[in-house]
């Protein structure tokens, strides 16, 4: 069976475990596998910005006109230090260092040229900065993919690098066209194929998907070659709740679910898979498996299109404490056709997508990511409507593929009430795949722990 497999950055940094637990675990199943690899942990954060904290990286230095050359040199030194750590695995150091030195030198030349173009004023600044961001993003995956192939070759395996970053390719191809062209004539069955998580395309993968680009490459490759299974290897299982909140011993591995549930998780920021990556695989009928790199014997969680649990159960408690409630109250709303359309036109102008929406006769409440709430956005709403309320909050969700049974909503609400947690807003669609509760931000972790204990663990907490 041919598989397409994505390996995340944290796992890539522990490449000895990737070799032992994934790539070379079964000597009879080394070939016929396509790996889409992320950059080593932290590298893309240094190139762009920290994914979670927003701390600026080299991109910000370039965009602001600061000295990015010194930062590039420092990163080159760090990448070579990473190389040295893989020498015991067979990485030929001189070859690996030569590759990254050349690639970083080329990157600096491109950025220098872009700096001159920016100074000329002939091109839109935004277009040049987007191109720079694309080039910076491409470096990390090219580095890790190149090293992976060299290590596999050193161990006597047939390995092929498909560098989709297009650094030395000026063909004006779309992302799909580049993937199709790169795989044309490739015999996947007889070798290991390692693919960069970044793909160059005229539409710009960063512009379209930002930091979710490696999963989008993974998805598009899976749709291109139609494997028996697509697999994502992470440093954790898809579990009933965040182990960092409830404790590793107080979770249940999901095991089986469907793409609808995966969409719900992605919508609230839980990193199962990027929503724009999941949809093409769902439509193509490609089953997706999520596995823990460090527990190779566990089958993980299989996601398919039509799966519905045989027994009614809650599969995941998810959510976020980094959201904001935006409520619009206006008496003119009553009976007015298309009133909410006017609101969403403002949302669209600011590029804002909501996570939850609830309405009554004269109020509409949206929950959005707090980073989307800018003074200009709020001011435009206040100028258009009678009363606008913004409030930092948290949202906790009860999610499952088979929850359409009487009493689930009541039970979840009672669990929150028993924990002294007030529900400020609630939403559930007819499909009953996700129940969303808006609560006060300081109550978030307590809510997750309480719901997980009562609904997923049956009230039995680990000692």
PLM segments and residue spans:
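Nucleotide/pyrophosphate-binding catalytic subdomain
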Residues: 1-273, 278, 438-440, 459-463
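Short glycine/serine/threonine/alanine-rich loop segments
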Residues: 157, 227-228, 286, 352, ...
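Conserved beta-strand edge residues that scaffold enzyme active sites
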Residues: 166, 236-237, 295, 361, ...
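Structured helix-beta-strand junction loops
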Residues: 189-190, 284, 350
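Short hydrophobic alpha-helical runs that function as membrane-insertion/retention elements
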Residues: 229-233, 288-290, 355
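A conserved active-site cap/scaffold subdomain adjacent to cofactor or substrate pockets
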Residues: 258-332
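A conserved regulatory-domain signal marking ACT and ACT-like small-molecule sensing domains
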Residues: 299-463
């Amino acid at each position: 069976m041919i598989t397409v497999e994505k390996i995340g950055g944290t796992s890539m940094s522990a490449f000895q475990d990737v070799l032992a637990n994934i790539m070379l675990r079964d000597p009879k199943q080394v070939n016929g596998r396509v790996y889409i690899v992320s950059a080593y942990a932290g590298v893309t954060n240094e190139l762009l910005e920290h994914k979670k904290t927003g701390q600026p990286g080299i991109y910000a230095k370039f965009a602001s006109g600061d000295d990015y050359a010194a930062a590039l040199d420092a990163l080159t030194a760090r990448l070579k230090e990473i190389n040295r750590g893989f020498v015991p695995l067979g990485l030929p150091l001189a070859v690996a260092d030569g590759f990254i030195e050349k690639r970083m030198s080329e990157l600096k030349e491109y950025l220098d040229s872009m700096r001159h173009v920016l100074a000329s004023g002939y091109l839109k600044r935004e277009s040049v900065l987007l191109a720079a961001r694309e080039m910076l993003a491409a470096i990390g995956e090219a580095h890790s993919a190149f090293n992976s192939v060299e290590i596999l070759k050193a161990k006597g395996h047939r390995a092929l690098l498909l560098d989709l970053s297009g650094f030395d390719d000026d063909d004006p191809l779309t992302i799909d066209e580049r993937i199709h062209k790169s795989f044309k004539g490739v015999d996947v069955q007889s070798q290991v194929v390692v693919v960069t998580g970044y793909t160059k395309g005229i539409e710009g993968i960063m512009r379209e998907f930002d930091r979710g680009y490696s999963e989008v490459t993974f998805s598009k490759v899976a749709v291109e070659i139609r494997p028996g299974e697509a697999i994502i290897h992470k440093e954790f299982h898809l579990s009933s709740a965040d182990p960092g909140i409830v404790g590793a011993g107080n979770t249940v591995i999901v095991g089986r679910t469907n793409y609808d549930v995966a969409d719900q998780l992605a919508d609230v920021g839980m990193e199962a898979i990027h929503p724009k990556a999941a949809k093409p695989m769902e439509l193509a009928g490609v089953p997706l498996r999520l596995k823990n790199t460090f527990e190779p014997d566990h089958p993980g969680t299989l996601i398919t299109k039509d799966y519905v649990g045989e027994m009614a159960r809650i599969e995941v408690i998810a959510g976020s404490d980094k959201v904001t409630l935006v409520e619009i109250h206006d008496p003119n709303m009553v009976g007015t056709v298309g009133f909410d359309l006017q609101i969403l036109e403002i949302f669209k102008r600011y590029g804002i997508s909501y996570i939850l929406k609830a309405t009554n006769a004269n109020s509409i409440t949206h929950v959005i990511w707090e980073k989307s709430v800018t003074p200009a956005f709020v001011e435009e709403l206040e100028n258009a409507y009678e009363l606008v309320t913004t409030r930092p909050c948290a949202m906790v969700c009860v999610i499952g593929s088979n929850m359409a049974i009487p009493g689930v909503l009541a039970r979840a609400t009672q669990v929150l009430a028993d924990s002294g947690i007030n529900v400020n807003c609630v939403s559930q669609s007819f499909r009953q795949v996700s129940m969303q509760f808006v609560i006060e931000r300081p109550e978030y972790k307590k809510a997750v722990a309480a719901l997980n204990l009562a609904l997923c663990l049956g009230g039995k907490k680990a000692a």
